[in-house]
Amino acid sequence: MEGVEGGPRGAGPPPARRGGARKVAWVLVDGLGDVGSPELGGRTPLQAAASPGLDALAAAGLSGLLDPVAPGIACGSDTAHLSLLGYEPRGLYRGRGAFESLGAGLRVDAGDIAFKCNFATLCEASGKITARRADRHFEAEGPVLCGALDDLRLPGFPDCRVRVRYATEHRCGVVVSGPGLSDQISGTDPLRDGLPLQVPRALDPADAAAEHTARVVAALSEQMTSVLKRHPINVERARQGKQLANVVLLRGCGGRLEVTPFRERHGLRACMVAPTKIIAGVGITLGIDVLDCPGATGDYRTNLTAKARAISAALAPGAPGDYDLGFLHVKAVDDAGHDGNLALKVNLLRAVGEMVRQLARLLWRHQQETGIEYVLCCTGDHSTPAAFGDHSHEPVPFTVAHLADVVRALGGEEALGCVSLEAVQMPPVDAPAAAAEAGGGRVPGAPVAGDAVGAFDEIAAAEGALGRFLGAGVVPLLKSFVLRP
């Protein structure tokens, strides 16, 4: 096969960029994939969701199965996004800390080390972490605690500067500046509840800089815990019987990557909506503009409609930035998988499908008014099966279609005009999985540009014309849709 190594079947090298090219709206659903569940009659959450919006997108275009990095790898969101955006993570990756910190708004310079961190609960008597996530709803308390930790002084290391910034939910970014630091160390996160807080160690004991850095980070962890356990917020949480946020788990130590910017690498001007800070940090690293989107929170309460409006506005002809590609990230589905909440994952996927219908309506308005054509794409960055509560290696469905074909699959312009642009209602966390709409949203047949797939799920996608391919093939495939006659 000619074209990108690991690319989809038939995806040859795209032609050179030309004027008047189409624009792409790319919806990335974090933790999209799953496995069949007995509670759902053997179906996956996507099959149970039977979303009219997602199924119409699949019916309108070309589908396949995507291994974001490579088959058999249960990848992290950061490595998956690097791969999907055309950057080989196995040759670049140096930890996720810089991504989280950049996304949170911290500056990361050459020589700095950065961490992706959790506010967590430490049992002081046993030294064990009883809860790696102190509280998912931490928007009020998190910034205050980060303020108490920012510019912390480390005894014995007067040349080191510590900066802390709140990210989302229970997360924060931490950057340490100082002479002779190395990112070749382990962190303090035991990765599972019920295990002891870890002591930072040099990955290579013969590496003097790493040994020095491990001592710095051990001092940092100790100082942070000392401040947090006395903080009035934790005094009040103890009084209320809540889990304490008395420790910061430091993980993913890394420095900032220096890479060829996305536009220079691919010839596309790109923007993204990504309230999840680690994804925003990946975008910043690659030179992708991260858009401000009020109401987009990166959790179960996010405003999906606000995201659709932001991407539509950014891709409007004549809009600032003159973007060719808008990347819309949805985090909540992944959280449901991590929380083991199968019904919530089903309901959230239906909400995402409704957002896709809204996005189609908003972009169709631009296309009708200006003649600029649009392409819609939807996929995930990895599977997060609710039964496992963590990332897994299963491939994820992928689909891409011309907007005009999506409109036909949704029932035509009249039906599209009936799609509400009111804010998509996010499902309650404890709601049961709602019954699928009559007919399941499947669209019989497919427009000319599509294949025989009529549903967006892990099983149907396996029959798609694109076959099974690697994340490295996504951007070249999208460029072929953008640039072909």
Q: What does each model-identified segment do?
A:
Residues 2-485:
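Feature captures the catalytic ectodomains and active-site-proximal regions of enzymes
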